[in-house]
Swiss-Prot record:
One GO CC term, this protein: cytoplasm
Protein name: 1-(5-phosphoribosyl)-5-[(5-phosphoribosylamino)methylideneamino] imidazole-4-carboxamide isomerase
Catalytic residues (UniProt): 8, 130
Protein localization: Cytoplasm
Keywords, ordered alphabetically: Amino-acid biosynthesis, Cytoplasm, Histidine biosynthesis, Isomerase
Similarity field: Belongs to the HisA/HisF family.
Pathway linked to the protein: Amino-acid biosynthesis; L-histidine biosynthesis; L-histidine from 5-phospho-alpha-D-ribose 1-diphosphate: step 4/9
């Protein structure tokens, strides 16, 4: 299992939101590439970048910061989400060197878009599903749906997506611990690898996930915990490597 540092971009700055609310923002750095360098120097094997403005506006907004990071670390896999709403945008990111495209809202509202992306960019598409009490939310978590996250995930098994990022909205940015039960429940019922996200607080969450890693949990995304220091990134990755 790999530990993936999150770099959430808003107005060119590195921030974290609480429960996906744009008005509840903490700025951790005004220099995203400096932030990326810090995690790379600590041994990050992948970076998770999110264009928060893009997620809300439906188009790339922080693409300059994203391409700068990708260019600075050409051998490092980078996954990007937020505002990827058509093939042209996806192609621009792939040509810039992005390794994986994260599709959130469009995966829920237009499943054919995911199928098309998978045909165009094999093994480079990650579906990001944000859920609250087992039901999917879209449009930067603003819009709740009546779609069950397990049922929706199963629909992507035939497309050949790389993985699913499962984020528990109720826990994200709240530093209350991960909802491991919900993550494992999803992982058990689908064949697609899972990247867990939302609520990681300390090394205890890593330990709990590692006991369930055989169900197909390939990675965990962490943001606020590594920025506020309640989780030591190097220690977390070392623990994963030893198990």
């Amino acid at each position: 299992m790999i530990v993936i540092p999150a770099i959430d971009l808003k107005d060119g700055q590195c921030v974290r939101l609480r429960q996906g609310l744009m008005e509840d923002t903490t700025v951790f750095s005004s220099n995203p590439i400096e932030m990326a360098t810090q995690w790379v120097e600590q041994g990050a094997r992948r970076l998770h970048l999110v264009d928060l403005n893009g997620a809300f506006e439906g188009r790339p907004v922080n693409s300059t910061s994203i391409t700068e990071i990708v260019s600075a670390f050409p051998d490092l896999p980078v996954q990007i989400g937020g505002g990827i709403r058509n093939i042209k945008i996806a192609n621009t990111y792939i040509e810039a060197g992005v390794s994986y495209l994260i599709i959130g809202t469009m995966a829920v509202t237009d499943s054919e878009f995911v199928s098309e992306l998978c045909r165009e960019f094999p093994n480079k598409v990650i579906v990001g599903l944000d859920a609250n009490n087992g039901f999917v939310a879209t449009k930067g978590w603003v819009q709740k749906t009546n779609l069950n996250v397990v049922d929706l995930s199963k629909k992507f098994e035939q497309d050949g997506i790389n993985s699913i990022i499962y984020t528990d909205i109720a826990r994200d940015g709240m530093m209350q611990g991960m909802n491991v039960e919900a993550i494992v429940n999803l992982a058990k019922q689908i064949s697609i690898p899972i990247i867990a996200s939302g609520g990681i607080t300390n090394i205890g969450d890593i330990i709990r996930l590692l006991t369930e890693v055989h169900f197909g949990i390939m990675g965990v995304i962490t943001g606020r915990a590594i920025y506020e220091g309640t989780l030591d990134f190097k220690q977390a990755q070392q623990l994963c490597d030893e198990n």
